[in-house]
């Protein structure tokens, strides 16, 4: 879309009622993977991340990069190939195994002692570790702190009632001087229940504003044919860079 004024003027809906009580269970997310309903996965990686990669990495080497609700994001391999250390968390064991298989990476797995039934999958190279567990259980495990967080398909997937808890966990994982790249979606939430959920600017300020500088890097029209089935006629992706205040 070339009409930047249209993107700038995307209507903001009050995020108080429409999707407030919407809840997806962990089992429902697992079923999406089993049923192949993973339209959120991007086989070619995220184009806005590619475009703003230098801004995100800032020329630094050997960074620790966290991927919340990572799925089988191909960007994890990108960062690992650049010498960074990648840690992700994902509820679907199938998604994690598919990542290693599709990226032709050998790996090992071991139980996470602090979380019954949970596992961690580690690449043989040692710089990719994916935790298969509920993200909200993650504070029970010492996974260290991170220089970078790539939040695409995570905040927009968390049940709206859990956002504050989610944000607290994310910020607790950041190191001094962190850079947090956040992708969210704007559409008419009265027409689609989510997920992905609608996250307005005001919500981002409410969640992150007290501890982070918030800068919107770009807004792009990402409407595709498949979105018509959601009952919407537009969808805009916004990319934010959050930095330490």
Swiss-Prot record:
The keyword Amino-acid biosynthesis does not apply. Belongs to the class I-like SAM-binding methyltransferase superfamily. TPMT family. It comes from the Eukaryota. It is an enzyme of class 2 (transferase). Gene3D superfamilies: Vaccinia Virus protein VP39. Monomer. This is Thiopurine S-methyltransferase. Pfam families: TPMT. It is found in: Cytoplasm. GO terms for cellular component: cytoplasm. The modification N6-acetyllysine is found at residue 58. One of its GO terms (molecular function) is thiopurine S-methyltransferase activity. Its EC number is 2.1.1.67. Keywords: Acetylation, Cytoplasm, Methyltransferase, S-adenosyl-L-methionine, Transferase. Substrate binds at residue 40. It catalyses: S-adenosyl-L-methionine + a thiopurine = S-adenosyl-L-homocysteine + a thiopurine S-methylether. GO terms for biological process: methylation. S-adenosyl-L-methionine binds at residues 29-40, 69, 90, 152. Disulfide bonds: none annotated.
């Amino acid at each position: 879309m070339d009409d930047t004024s249209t993107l700038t003027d995307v209507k903001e809906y009050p995020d108080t009622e429409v999707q407030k009580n919407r809840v997806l269970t962990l089992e429902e997310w697992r079923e999406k993977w089993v049923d192949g309903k993973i339209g959120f996965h991007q086989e070619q990686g995220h184009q806005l991340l590619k475009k703003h990669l230098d801004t995100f990495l800032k020329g630094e080497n050997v960074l620790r990069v966290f991927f919340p609700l990572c799925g089988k994001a191909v960007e994890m391999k990108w960062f690992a190939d650049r010498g960074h250390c990648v840690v992700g968390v994902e509820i679907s064991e199938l998604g994690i195994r598919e990542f290693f298989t599709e990226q032709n990476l050998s790996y090992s797995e071991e139980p996470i002692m602090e979380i019954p039934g949970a596992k961690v999958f580690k690449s043989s190279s040692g710089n990719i570790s994916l935790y298969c567990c509920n993200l909200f259980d993650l504070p029970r495990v010492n996974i260290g702190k991170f220089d970078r967080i790539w939040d695409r398909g995570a905040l927009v997937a968390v049940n709206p009632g859990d956002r504050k808890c989610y944000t607290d966990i994310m910020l607790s994982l950041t190191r001094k001087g962190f850079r947090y790249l956040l992708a969210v979606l704007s559409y008419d939430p009265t027409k689609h229940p989510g997920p992905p959920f609608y996250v307005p600017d005001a919500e981002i300020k409410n969640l992150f504003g007290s501890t982070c500088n918030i800068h919107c890097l770009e807004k792009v029209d990402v409407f595709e044919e498949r979105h018509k089935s959601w009952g919407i006629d537009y969808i805009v992706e916004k990319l934010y860079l959050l930095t330490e205040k």
